[in-house]
């Protein structure tokens, strides 16, 4: 059967629905609700380790299932990995990199009655390592690095493939369309994926801390002896700062360079210039460079530890439409 076209509806499986898997599940359902027909998924099946996780996933997606445009979702225990993968056209590996060995064991007996695309979301694990571990896999193998922003359709998803499992045009289009429904897609050579991951996925945590720090600087409970009447509630400060960050990103995406943007905002002797002097004194830019470099190195190191043991246990259940 064809994997994805304008008229066919593939089955998608997410094996190991942790934080990133849940975010992707939510993003795909929201895309189906807001843009029906953009990516035509017939059915979604996810596997989890525990009844508790199954309940959390169910609660998180329940409001989205009220829309008739949203495909049905099945939440199954992880010992169903093989059966779930056999019934899928696109299989996403959402477990931790340390669970690769366990996953290989689960999938060894699966039938290869039709061609499936395998997409790994595991941090630091190259397509080559996946191909080596799943030597019995006959279809295309792709590595995807996305962030939890897939839940709101704002992720940058970085994609690469193995030389041994180069994708045909149809498979490449299917993967591109799947992730384009939850953000922006960029294909890269595998050799660049570790460094790109540092700024494409991990950086959300860094940006969040920067936004929080800026907001705290003008918030009531963090004022340095200033008149509290002049301070903002933290929630308000966070909302303002987050929107300013969004505006910054939008300008940079329209080809405004960072240096030009700084020059547009900061005037000699002005308030912004005073703040920039603090950042320069504290060596913020150098700190961020070091942060990105260390994160990239740590991502590369993950591939060395892939294949150990991983997650937990659950009960079969179908998520009903609300």
Swiss-Prot record:
Enzyme Commission number: 1.5.1.2
Domain of life: Eukaryota
GO terms of molecular function: pyrroline-5-carboxylate reductase activity
Ranges for region Disordered: 302-322
GO BP field: alkaloid metabolic process; L-proline biosynthetic process
Residue ranges crossing the lipid bilayer per the database entry: 9-29, 117-137
Annotated protein name in UniProt: Pyrroline-5-carboxylate reductase
């Amino acid at each position: 059967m064809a994997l994805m076209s304008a008229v066919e509806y593939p089955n998608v499986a997410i094996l190991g629905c942790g934080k990133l898997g849940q975010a992707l599940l939510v993003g795909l359902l929201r895309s189906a609700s807001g843009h029906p027909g953009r990516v035509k998924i017939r059915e979604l099946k996810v596997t989890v380790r525990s009844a508790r996780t199954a309940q959390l996933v169910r609660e998180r997606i329940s409001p989205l299932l009220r829309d008739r445009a949203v495909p049905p979702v099945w939440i199954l225990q992880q010992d169903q990995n093989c059966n779930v993968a056999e019934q899928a056209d696109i299989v996403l590996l959402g477990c931790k990199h340390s669970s690769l060995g366990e996953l290989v064991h689960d999938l060894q007996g699966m039938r290869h009655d039709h061609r499936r695309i395998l997409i790994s979301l595991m941090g630091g694990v190259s397509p080559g390592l996946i191909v080596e571990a799943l030597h019995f896999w006959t279809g295309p193998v792709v590595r995807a690095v996305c962030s939890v922003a897939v839940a709101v359709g704002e992720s940058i998803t970085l994609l690469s493939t193995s030389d041994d499992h180069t994708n045909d045009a149809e498979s490449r289009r299917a993967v591109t369309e799947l992730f384009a429904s939850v953000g922006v897609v960029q294909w890269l050579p595998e050799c660049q994926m570790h460094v790109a991951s540092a700024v494409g996925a991990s950086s959300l945590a860094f940006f969040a801390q920067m936004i929080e720090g800026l907001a705290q600087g003008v918030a009531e409970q963090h004022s340095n002896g200033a008149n509290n009447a002049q301070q903002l509630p933290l929630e308000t400060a966070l909302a303002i700062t987050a929107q300013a960050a969004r505006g910054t990103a939008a300008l940079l995406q329209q080809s405004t360079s960072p240096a030009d943007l700084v020059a547009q905002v900061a005037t000699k002797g002005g308030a912004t210039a005073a703040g920039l002097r603090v950042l320069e004194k504290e060596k913020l830019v150098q700190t961020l460079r070091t942060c990105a470099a260390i994160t990239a190195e740590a991502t590369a190191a993950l591939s060395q530890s892939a294949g150990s043991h991983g997650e937990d246990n659950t009960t079969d259940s179908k998520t009903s439409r609300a």
